[in-house]
C-alpha cells in the first residue's frame, strides 16, 4: 500500500486507541493488535506505522513520560485523562523517534485526535505540552520554525 498523509493519520488514530486500551486493561500487545486487525478495516491504514507507534510507546513508556512530565504543571501522571495520556505518549514517541515527520505535523495530528476523543478543551492542553516537548526534543527544527 502507498503511504499517504491519510494512511498515516488512520494509523495514528488506531494506535492511540490501541495504546489507550493497553493502558486500561494491560492485555499483551499482540492480543490488542490482533483485535484491531480483526475488528477494523485496516486496508487504508499504514499498518507498519500503527505497529511502530503502538509497540514503540509500550517499549519506551517511562522514557516518553519523562519527556513530557516536566511540562504538566505539577499535575501527577495519574490525574491525566487516559486519552490525553495515550496521545501525549504517542506524539512524544513520534517527536523523539520519527524526525522524518515534521514536529508541526505530529502536534497537529495529536490535537485533532484530542478534539475527537479527548475531554473538553484537552486539545489545548495537548498542544501546549507537545509544543514544549518539541522545543526540547527538536530544538533545531523548532527554533528554525520560530524565527
Swiss-Prot record:
One of its GO terms (biological process) is transcription antitermination. InterPro entries: NusB-like_sf, NusB_fam, NusB_RsmB_TIM44. Pfam families: NusB. One of its GO terms (molecular function) is RNA binding. CDD domains: Terminator_NusB (cd00619). Keywords: RNA-binding, Transcription, Transcription antitermination, Transcription regulation. The keyword Nucleotide-binding does not apply. GO terms for cellular component: cytosol. PANTHER family: ANTITERMINATION NUSB DOMAIN-CONTAINING PROTEIN, N UTILIZATION SUBSTANCE PROTEIN B-RELATED. Involved in transcription antitermination. Required for transcription of ribosomal RNA (rRNA) genes. Binds specifically to the boxA antiterminator sequence of the ribosomal RNA (rrn) operons. Belongs to the NusB family. This is Transcription antitermination protein NusB. The gene is nusB.
Amino acid at each position: 500500500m502507498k503511504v499517504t498523509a491519510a494512511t498515516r493519520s488512520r494509523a495514528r488514530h488506531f494506535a492511540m486507541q490501541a495504546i489507550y486500551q493497553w493502558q486500561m486493561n494491560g492485555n499483551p500487545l499482540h492480543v490488542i493488535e490482533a483485535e484491531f486487525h480483526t475488528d477494523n478495516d485496516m486496508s487504508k491504514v499504514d499498518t507498519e506505522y500503527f505497529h511502530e507507534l503502538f509497540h514503540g510507546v509500550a517499549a519506551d513508556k517511562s522514557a516518553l513520560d519523562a519527556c513530557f512530565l516536566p511540562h504538566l504543571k505539577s499535575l501527577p501522571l495519574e490525574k491525566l485523562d487516559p486519552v490525553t495520556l495515550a496521545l501525549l505518549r504517542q506524539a512524544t514517541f513520534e517527536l523523539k523517534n520519527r524526525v522524518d515527520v515534521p514536529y508541526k505535523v505530529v502536534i497537529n495530528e495529536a490535537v485533532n485526535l484530542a478534539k475527537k476523543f479527548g475531554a473538553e478543551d484537552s486539545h489545548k492542553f495537548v498542544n501546549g505540552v507537545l509544543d514544549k516537548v518539541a522545543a526540547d526534543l527538536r530544538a533545531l527544527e523548532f527554533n528554525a520554525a520560530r524565527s
